[in-house]
């Protein structure tokens, strides 16, 4: 719906998808890019089992449900995601969101089980969504996915409208 509601058409339209394709990103590189966000905050690298056991590319030999999800299989020792990653901006955001869940699992893995449930069902989702809010134009520029960061009133309003349509409309 954003394309028909964009307040200032064409202002600060960031074509991250084009950059991902032009730079030869694949499912693994996109996942590693999302992981690098967390390691840049001082969090540990994901365990090798994450990459061995996660489904990030749609298998050609069988049907799977491609809805993205994060899993804590063995009390934080075998975190996984299931996401049929496509090379586009939305999927890059979804990877950051899903890895938000994974890092949350990793951070509470040593807590007693009574403390592993969220205070509210929406809390876990809020963790992932908060991470996506950090995917600012400055962040995308540092990752080499955009050339310039346009700072203007119009660009700010467009970004806020897009965010409102993607996130705020779905709040309970």
Model regions: which residues?
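Cation-handling catalytic/transport regions enriched in His/Asp/Glu
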Residues: 1-172
